Amino acid sequence: MAKVLVLYYSSYGHVETMAQHVAEGAKSVPGVEVTLKRVPETIPVDQAKAIGVKVDQAAPVATVDELANYDAIIFGTPTRFGNMAGQMRTFLDQTGGLWMKGALVGKIGSVFASTGTQHGGQETTITSFHTTLLHHGMVIVGVPYACSGLVDMKEITGGTPYGATTLAGADGSRQPSANELDIARYQGKHVAQLAAKLAA
């Protein structure tokens, strides 16, 4: 049975919502075991609460060593100046031991993201994230244009061939749209299907 991990960091809940839908899509594939986890928060709890960070997320916190247990990992992160969030970077910077052992070589890696604005770095966040995955020897999977939501021109929407995205708005008030969640589910399903084939 293929094992898929959806691993995310979310400050205000947007990436958390996307992660839940990515996991839902992955779970729709028979013969795949899906786990949803988050990386540790690095901001002290009192400070995090003071700035509105959602500290009560249900997903358990992952450990670095467990990454080797999965056939595919779908990472989710908000954007920080066109790059992944510091919390995700801190977590991945602890994977040197896995790299030394080649523990992630040949496993699928995929990324989804959230940005504050339409041109806030959603694509560069994902493609710069890919650099770390390539150093680990992972096989990168995005969202193919077979996903019709990528060409939706009826509304302002996230979604790229590099991975699902959502636009949170400058004040964080915009929640993931139906189209963005559809793309997230598609990404989860697509990765899970490929993981199942590789694990067969």
Curated annotation (Swiss-Prot):
Task: Give binding positions for FMN.
Answer: 10-15, 79-81, 114-120, 135
Quickly give the catalysed reaction: a quinone + NADH + H(+) = a quinol + NAD(+); a quinone + NADPH + H(+) = a quinol + NADP(+)
Enzyme Commission numbers on file: 1.6.5.2
Entry's Gene Ontology molecular function annotations: flavin adenine dinucleotide binding; FMN binding; NAD binding; NADH:ubiquinone reductase (non-electrogenic) activity; NADP binding; NADPH dehydrogenase (quinone) activity
Q: Which NCBIfam families match?
A: flav_wrbA, PRK03767.1
Q: Which GO terms describe its cellular component?
A: membrane
List residues binding substrate: 99
Domain Flavodoxin-like spans what residues? Answer: 4-191
Cofactor, how bound (note): Binds 1 FMN per monomer.
Query: What Pfam families does the database record attribute to this sequence?
Result: FMN_red
Q: Which cofactor does this sequence's record say it needs? A: FMN
Binding residues for NAD(+): 12
Q: Which organism is it from?
A: Burkholderia vietnamiensis (strain G4 / LMG 22486) (Burkholderia cepacia (strain R1808))
Which family does the similarity line name?
Belongs to the WrbA family.
Gene3D superfamilies in the record? 3.40.50.360
Q: Which UniProt keywords apply?
A: Flavoprotein, FMN, NAD, NADP, Nucleotide-binding, Oxidoreductase
Name this polypeptide is given: NAD(P)H dehydrogenase (quinone)
Enzyme class, top EC level, equals oxidoreductase
